[in-house]
């Protein structure tokens, strides 16, 4: 079930409320310090939230300096909307089609609609003055705060599960080398969860190899360089005294050597090469000067002898 536009708009509003700075205490008797929002202020806020809901952040000032001075809780509103715009991009473009996620989305939409009908900060009740006082804003935000905090936590958990489902889906598809089926999810994960993705993929050398070949097909130098450095850094972080991690590191390193030696696109530079040579020394110390280089050769999934040559020279 696709995320409705109304749901996205409402979610943008309430994420902003949930992330707002704590409201300062009102100074009794000092009416000049009251936080009031004019119709223009309200219009600007609504326009900015609509933009954020469309995954577009505004670089221009949303509220005047006078308004921000009187309403310091809104001083970081532009930065919050940039964050919200990113959240909206995630919710509008990402998701896994399964019943559990669909039910969660329906539940969130229902809860948000119920809250919006009763507590809409941008609509005045009949007879209310043209501007909203800070007291009225405090009352509305306080009434929503506990509910929205809980709901936001649920949304965060849903998002984590969505990413986990994407990673598992990509992993299973790569097992059969079905790269056409992973394209949309892979592009999302490359931007948002590359480390987590390769933490999963590196547990199976064939799956990792299929992904590296998929990256090569895309011929995106920036993505390729990020992938290369992500896997290198993960190999560096492994505990070589742990047999399972040692095996993962060896397979991952040989895959990288195969990939960089057969790729038509150059992703790394001298720095990446030096790291891989150093890792070869750490992971294949017995291969230096080898003739058959059985350990490296047994892990080589490409048709060339580059991994063997590197192990012989640097092991």
UniProtKB/Swiss-Prot annotation:
Keywords, comma-separated and alphabetical: Coiled coil, Signal
Extent of the signal sequence: 1-20
The keyword Membrane appears for this protein: no
Observed effect of gene inactivation: (Microbial infection) RNAi-mediated knockdown results in reduced replication of duck Tembusu virus in salivary gland after an infectious blood meal. Reduced release of duck Tembusu virus in saliva. Up-regulation of antimicrobial peptides in response to duck Tembusu virus infection. Increased expression of macroglobulin complement-related factor.
Triggers of expression: (Microbial infection) Up-regulated in salivary glands following duck Tembusu virus infection.
Coiled coil: 98-161
Function recorded in the entry: (Microbial infection) Modulates replication of duck Tembusu virus in salivary glands and virus release into the saliva, probably via the regulation of antimicrobial peptides expression in response to duck Tembusu virus infection.
Protein name: Salivary protein SG34
Organism expressing this protein natively: Aedes albopictus (Asian tiger mosquito)
């Amino acid at each position: 079930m696709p995320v409705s536009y109304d749901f996205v708009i409402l979610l943008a509003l309430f994420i902003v409320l949930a992330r707002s700075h704590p409201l300062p205490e009102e100074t009794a008797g000092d009416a000049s310090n009251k936080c009031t929002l004019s119709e223009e202020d309200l219009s600007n806020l609504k326009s900015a939230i609509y933009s954020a809901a469309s995954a577009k952040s505004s670089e221009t000032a949303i509220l005047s300096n006078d308004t921000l001075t009187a309403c310091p809780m809104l001083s970081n509103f532009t930065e919050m909307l940039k964050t919200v715009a990113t959240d909206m991009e995630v919710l509008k473009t990402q998701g896994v089609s399964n019943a559990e996620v669909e039910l969660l989305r329906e539940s969130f939409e229902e809860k948000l609609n119920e809250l919006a009908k009763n507590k809409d900060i941008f609509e005045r009740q009949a007879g209310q003055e043209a501007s909203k006082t800070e007291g009225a804003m405090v009352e509305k935000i306080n009434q929503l705060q506990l509910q929205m905090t809980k709901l936001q936590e649920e949304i965060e958990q849903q998002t984590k599960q969505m990413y986990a489902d994407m990673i598992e889906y990509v992993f299973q598809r790569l097992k059969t080398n079905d790269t056409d089926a992973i394209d949309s999810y892979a592009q999302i994960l490359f931007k948002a969860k590359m480390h987590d993705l390769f933490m999963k993929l590196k547990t199976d050398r064939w799956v990792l190899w299929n992904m590296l070949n998929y990256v090569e097909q895309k011929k995106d130098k920036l993505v390729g360089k990020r992938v290369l450095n992500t896997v290198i850094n993960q190999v560096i972080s492994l505990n070589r005294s742990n047999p399972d991690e040692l095996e993962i590191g060896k397979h991952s390193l040989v895959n990288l050597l195969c990939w960089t030696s057969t790729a038509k696109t150059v992703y790394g530079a001298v720095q990446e090469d030096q790291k891989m040579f150093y890792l070869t020394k750490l992971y294949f110390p017995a291969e230096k000067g080898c003739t058959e280089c059985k350990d490296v050769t047994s892990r080589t999934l490409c048709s060339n002898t580059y991994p063997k040559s590197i192990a012989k020279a640097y092991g």
